[in-house]
């Protein structure tokens, strides 16, 4: 057995994979002594996803050596959707070219999923001149995105030292969601004294935020017409980060 990894909530792992599956049909995961990592750019080249699940997140983490494994996320997600609320997830790999997936609870169910070619280019995360860093509750950001969707498929992120604004404009309508430090949805706001306004696709944000609970904290960084960094934690130790390309539109105000 080259590795055996146990996560105590199959349902929670399902939510994580469901988010990844929105952007990728298949994915390559690096499994090593430190944990599980994945970094990839979606086929549209709009979203870069960076996943890091350290070994401390798992109730059992036994890895003999570092290796890359790749598999079909849609098939994996279908398996995870069978999990009950108290089921434990077991992932293991032996000498065969399969990933064994176990759902252990009132019944113990095992699947073998075929592994595929794990070749993938190395992807560097760029250092960007972000001028805004904010910590918001996922529920507040979800509602801002939902409101924007009513009038446009793009949403502007804007900031001043006092407030964070989400704005969308349609042919004959406009919506704004404004958060200040007096509002429960905005936990922290840092703003450099430069212009900060960028537009991003509503659909991408919806897919990222869908699996988060309203009380989850989300870190966002943006600036002027540069990619948005959106990051949230997995049990205070793991991290999932998304770098989303901006929509640069001519003639906007």
Curated annotation (Swiss-Prot):
CDD domains per UniProt: PCNA
Gene3D superfamilies registered for this protein in UniProt: 3.70.10.10
InterPro entries linked to this entry: DNA_clamp_sf, Pr_cel_nuc_antig, Pr_cel_nuc_antig_C, Pr_cel_nuc_antig_CS, Pr_cel_nuc_antig_N
GO-annotated molecular function: DNA binding; DNA polymerase processivity factor activity; identical protein binding
UniProt cross-references to PROSITE patterns, sorted A to Z: PCNA_1 (PS01251)
Activity regulation remarks: Inhibited by interaction with the PCNA inhibitor TIP.
Alphabetical keyword list: DNA replication, DNA-binding
A GO BP entry: regulation of DNA replication
Assembly description: Homotrimer. The subunits circularize to form a toroid; DNA passes through its center. Replication factor C (RFC) is required to load the toroid on the DNA. Interacts with TIP.
Function (record text): Sliding clamp subunit that acts as a moving platform for DNA processing. Responsible for tethering the catalytic subunit of DNA polymerase and other proteins to DNA during high-speed replication.
PANTHER family, per the entry: PROLIFERATING CELL NUCLEAR ANTIGEN (PTHR11352:SF0)
Family of the protein in this entry: Belongs to the PCNA family.
Protein name (database record): DNA polymerase sliding clamp 2
Source organism of the structure: Thermococcus kodakarensis (strain ATCC BAA-918 / JCM 12380 / KOD1)
